[in-house]
A protein has these predicted regions:
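Acidic, Ser/Thr/Pro-rich regulatory low-complexity segments at or just upstream of the first helical elements
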Residues: 1-101, 110-157
Length: 157
């Protein structure tokens, strides 16, 4: 208990009298952020992949940036999309024929989190030139969410 008080004191001692600073929650917030750091991707996660390589990931990211711009999405959406992809690839292997599906499903998830008007699933099938149907996108969305334990965001630095 003493350590918690010391952390709160050290972090927010200048704001301890400000009710808007909600210093009572500092310890809980820092614990949450420390726990969330554990969800970051492994550093060398691409070495774990057997059917894809870093160049393929780069091509996917370039394509997603183009899609992001075409749909006029917010900057945080593309950042979250890439973070979701990296966290998923850090935990699961994927076949190269599913990599674009992973990307579009991650964009779909991120856009629902960040955008006021996210694209519809039909837009996701359209941008893949109908390589995947709506059910494929929705199934991959659920696969990703389950793998990430429904934790969409994690610290990125």
């Amino acid at each position: 208990m003493k350590r918690q008080r010391d952390v709160r004191y050290a972090v927010d001692k200048d704001e301890s009298d400000d009710p808007q600073a909600v210093t009572d929650y500092v310890v809980d917030l820092y614990k949450y952020y420390r726990d969330a750091e554990e969800k970051r991707p492994m550093e060398l996660y691409m070495e774990f992949q057997q059917d894809i390589n870093p160049k393929m990931r780069g091509i996917l990211v370039d394509w997603l940036v183009e899609v992001h711009l075409k749909f006029k999405m917010l900057q945080p959406t593309i950042y979250l999309t890439i973070q979701i992809i990296d966290r998923y690839l850090s935990a699961k292997q994927i076949d190269r024929n599913k990599l674009q599906l992973l990307g579009v499903a991650a964009l779909f998830i991120a856009s629902k989190y960040e955008e006021i008007y996210p694209p519809e699933v039909a837009d996701c099938t359209y941008i893949t030139d109908h390589a995947y149907d709506a059910q494929d996108v929705l199934d991959m969305e659920m696969t990703i969410l389950r793998e990430l334990d429904w934790n969409i965001t994690a610290p990125n630095a």
